[in-house]
Amino acid sequence: MSKAATKNLVIVESPAKAATIERYLGPDYTVIASYGHVRDLPQKSRRAAKGSVAAKRPKRKKGDPPAPKPAKGLGSLAVDVENGFTPHYEIIEEKEGRLADIRRAAKGAEAVWLATDLDREGEAIAWHLAEALEIPEADRRRVTFSEITKGAILESFSHPRGINLDLVNAQQARRILDRLVGYKLSPLLSRLVAPRSSAGRVQSVALRLVVERERAIRAFIPRHYSTVELGVRPAVDPDLVIPASLVGPKGENLEVEPEVAEAAVARVTGGVAIVTERTESTRKQRPVPPFTTSTLQQEAGRKHGYRSRVTMQLAQKLYEGVDIGGERTGLITYMRTDSPTLSQQAISEAADVIRTRFGAEAVVEGGRQYASKSKNAQEAHEAIRPTSFHRTPEEVASYLDDRELRVYTLIWRRAIASQMPDKLSATTTLFWSVGEDRLKTNATRTLEPGFTAVYLEGKDDEEEDAEAQLPDLPEGSKGEVATAEAVAHQTKPEPRFTEPTLVKELEKHGIGRPSTYAAIIERIQEREYVDRDRENRLRATRLGETVCDLLTTHFTAFVDLGFTAGMEEELDAVAEGRADWREVLGKFWATFEPLVTEKATSIGAGEYRNRPSDEKCSEGHPMEERLGRFGWYLACSLYPEHSERKSLSKVIGDDTPGGDVPTLEGAGLPCPQCGAEHGGKMAQRRSRFGYFLGCDRYPECKFIPKAEVPEEFRLAFEALCPVCGGEHGGKLRPRRNNKRNTYFYSCDRYPECKTIRPRPTGATHAECGATIGKDDEGGICTRCGARVDLPEGELVGLVIAGGTADPLAFAPKRGRRVAADGKAKAEGNKAKVASRARTVKSKGKPKRIPAAAAVAAAELSASDAAGGEDEAT
């Protein structure tokens, strides 16, 4: 700490909000960040964990108290199942330096305030901090707030409470459950299916939903039918053509065979249509509630295509605060909630804004409140809303990037709309007769837009009805059937899940919680159980289907939707003090552990790696589907006597024409390297990165033609490397990422220089003379990280000024285990932090890394602290 002593030490999770809270509380308070959890179940067994606290404990000196003995029989679980499921927590290795800083600061403080997030995860972090700091129970001051505003902060500090152990036990039970399932099932899957296969209590159920939807799509048999769509020209307005449909005697839509539809077209075309019935009806449409975590993820995915993880990262930044007019301000309330309710203060403020912008008639007297539709809505938090409705999207637009503004606009508009009147619409229905045939016309018009003047919810799979205005056509009015057409249709299966619709399905079944949705979906994609089709929808891979088959066959109850939802209800009961967490775990373990033990010996080793198929090899022998290093393939069942093999796509069904297996130009041509001398030819081959051309004499000839960079990724100018260009002349060039099948821009002196930057634009940054690149957020200097505005049109040769240097812009965020600099407690301290460095252990040897990179990586881990399940590989 920079101060020798402080009266009050406040511990929060994220450094981004520390400076804001410290400013609100005044000089008697110092705020420091824990960067998420500081203690957890160890990731390795005690014997293997070289970096664990136990392994690094110093030698005892004379007079030291006896060292605590490690619990026996814990193994890699770190949970004593024989002693009430007592967990063995350890300080997270990369948090030891951070905890030491907090401990030093706490020693000189008169009071320590635990201000971690207000959900179960935050409550558990507060408890772990209190335990690690050895704060007496009577002195544990716990404060929570749902928004980072001065009023909310001061109010929470005026009413501290103790740590809610029911919430802690609910989180602890979930953590142990996930450890038991992950560490017991994952090794079994890795042995029986593929290395690195994993199972999780919730992720496996999410996988089952995706697999079952995929199989339903494959098994679906479409039904073909036709409808008859017509256009009627009324006698009162010959220039107007009113759309109509052929219906049955009761007004039902007719779905008929194509020949029946064609006969109807011939029968009614040119006929006289007479209005036999006219009805008017009105409909009220209520506004949708303010956002919860799941509905925000769904809507951001539908309207902007954001993945759940991206949405949560953007919402986290809006919650923690952005710099507005030189002052960091929290823009939204806490973003992990399943409650759609608003406080009375928020409702009153929303009414003021509505009255000003839309008039007094747009204010709903008394406001609106909403009840959660979630099966197992958790603690009574507020919905996600702006911290101030007076802070409109237009007012904050200049302080946010495009993606942040889109998310803030969604939240502001949805919350405002939730307090506005219903939409009122009128529908006119006309029934016509043409001889013995009956036609129907529907036309809907808006009478009062109500809340839709501000916000209209997106749809997953349907379009909004188009509005139409009909002329005054009383019964008996006549017209001519001007057009008639038989329109062919076919029934369609339910579509593949998108991330938003999968979140919706999980929530509908009561599976998962606000803090876990994004992590669940990320995990099943990381393990390659699920990938994305051309429309960005989730589809199960062969590996995912195989893992799902094993789990549903041998562990049916534990991947059952009802069972998993029931476990969530039991955890909720623990959080509410209605159930004992040890009893919940004991009941689960009593059935789970014997089943895993039995299946470990009864399932055949090759049962899920070799599967029969309907294919025959060139000699007529049956072929088997087998799982190899690079995925699934077909092999002759007589291998090794007959070694014929065929590639299989990652997803079942993509092997058919029109699937994802490409046809590469050049296959069959002579190999440029050995064709003349040895007769080698170019053949289409496959690796774990996809299909490529290579010599068919491999490994004798290893020739692979260099892939040509597609036109859209080429640069028409030279861009110097911002790191080594001046001294060594390195240039940024497009390089292919084989795994993701895309291109990135890196120094052509690799591996001497490993610089990677966004795509160069050809413009130069005036302040530092480096090339300006362009990423998803706009222009960025490739040297100093300053954000700049890019004008429209040609950029090559332009010199653009502006932007503030950002030393964290290109800091590494993955691949290193780092400790955050204990003296960097606020994002506003970036420039000072960038000059320091911490020494961390890497493979047993000291290694210096920039402290800025340490902070960046620690912030990333802090933002991810709330989600995920255990797995052992």
Question: Regions from the language model: what does each represent?
Answer:
Residues 1-175, 184, 247-248, 252-255, ...:
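Intrinsically disordered, low-complexity regulatory segments
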Residues 2-7, 19-20, 186, 219, ...:
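Basic, low-complexity terminal or inter-domain segments flanking catalytic cores
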Residues 6-7, 117-118, 193-198, 280-289, ...:
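Conserved short loop/turn motifs at secondary-structure junctions
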Residues 15-18, 35-40, 118-122, 146-151, ...:
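Conserved nucleotide-binding/hydrolysis micro-motifs of P-loop NTPases
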Residues 20-24, 101, 105, 124-132, ...:
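Alpha-helical scaffold elements adjacent to nucleotide-binding pockets in ATP/GTP-utilizing enzyme cores
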Residues 101, 148-230, 280-284:
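C-terminal or mid-to-C-terminal helical accessory/interaction module adjacent to the motor/catalytic core
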Residues 253-290, 477:
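Metal- or metallocofactor-binding catalytic centers and their adjacent structured scaffolds
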Residues 275-278, 286-300, 326-335, 493-505:
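Short acidic, hydrophobic short linear motifs in intrinsically disordered regions
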